């Protein structure tokens, strides 16, 4: 299993497109994966945008009612991935940014390196 961990705060303009591109990437490069998103106290429409994707993608959203910061969001996502794995020596986690700082088009190359 590959866990894509995405911390986000007020990423309404980009998070939907990112999830769509991740889906397209894994259609062309099939792997078992799960997307874990931390919505870190967003005050925009981030939560509303994430909701429909949870119905069509292997997506879990962790919502913080108030902002805790990037490091705590990453820690929470990695802990969630560790708690979910039943193959810790085989599974991996990749941290991505919701603003396309790390584009999904690089995922196949990253996964091949694992």
Which residues does each PLM region occupy?
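Structured catalytic core of nucleotide-sugar glycosyltransferases
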Residues: 1-114
């Amino acid at each position: 299993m590959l866990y894509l961990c995405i911390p986000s705060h007020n990423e309404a303009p980009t998070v939907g497109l990112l999830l769509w591109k991740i889906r397209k990437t894994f259609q062309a490069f099939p792997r078992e994966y799960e997307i874990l998103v931390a919505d870190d106290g967003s005050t925009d429409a981030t939560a509303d945008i994430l909701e429909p994707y949870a119905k069509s993608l292997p997506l879990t959203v962790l919502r913080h009612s108030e902002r805790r910061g990037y490091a705590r969001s990453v820690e929470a996502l990695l802990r969630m991935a560790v708690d979910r794995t039943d193959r810790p020596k085989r599974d991996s986690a990749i941290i991505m940014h919701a603003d396309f700082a790390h584009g999904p088009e690089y995922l196949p190359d990253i996964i091949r390196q694992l």
